[in-house]
Amino acid sequence: MAATHRLARGFTGRDHILTCGYHGWVNAMGGSGVPEAINSVYHALPWGNLSPFEAAFDELGSDNIAAVSVACSYADIELGHQFLPALRDLTERHGALLIFDEIVTGFRLARGGAQQYFDVTPDLAVFAKGMSNGVPLSAYLGRRDVMEKVRDVVISSTFGGDTLGLAAAQAVMAIYERENVIDTLWARGLRLHEGITAIAGRRAVPVGMAGLPPVGQIELPSAEARVALEGECLQRGVILYSVVYPNFSHTDADVDQALGVIDEALAAVQRRGLLD
């Protein structure tokens, strides 16, 4: 993501970046240990509400904002149907670039990520993770005129010449050509969503699923309950995180096993009084 931000600044000649969502290390650009000069040009704004972005353009001035950089909020991702086209229009009106963080959504929500699912084309995008089945690799891409600015912008990587990730990506692309990966991810995710929802209903606990099936998220009443659930699942052989992402290698039997473990884990958390 940092590469696209530098490229956007080089292309537009502007300094400020409006960010939305989780960009990994880039989120820390506005945090502790970062010089105020850098903090001052990153502005984190909420998902799904255009008003703060409009206000930022008014306050900072159109000539000062290089880009709006967006990662979808997975719990309420469907707001993207209205929010992302509105951001596309806003950035075009002000001459800023629109950047999509497709590190999670790419090759998962749709093969082309959020831009394909929501039918909104950004100026720049970043893909990783799914494109190489977890082997370290990332790629930034975009409009030809913007990408040509790479010649004038210093972007380097210690492992940029490594070929293992490229070989992994080549193998992954071949599987995407042969197999119906995306539909499988949606089907496995739906099975998880429906299963967890049914378990919570049967146990009468305040636990639910948010987001879309390929990028689902378990909602619990407290952070303590979440940590407890993850620990109970881990003890039973299932690694669970706040997000519940199926992958193509998971079978129906794997999903059933995970649901059985989640059922037992929720019962244990309930006995501890964390789901009252």
How does the language model describe each region?
Residues 55, 72-94:
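Active-site core of PLP-dependent enzymes with the aminotransferase class I/II
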Residues 93-94, 203, 236:
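Helix C-cap/helix->beta junction micro-motif
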Residues 172-197:
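Structural signature of PLP-dependent enzymes
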Residues 1-67, 88:
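PLP-dependent aspartate aminotransferase-fold enzymes
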Residues 189-231:
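Conserved PLP-binding catalytic core of the aspartate aminotransferase-like
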Residues 119-149, 161-168:
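Active-site PLP attachment segment
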Residues 177-179, 235-276:
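PLP-dependent enzyme catalytic core of the Aspartate aminotransferase-like
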Residues 152-161, 177:
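A short glycine-threonine-serine/GTX helix/turn-capping micro-motif
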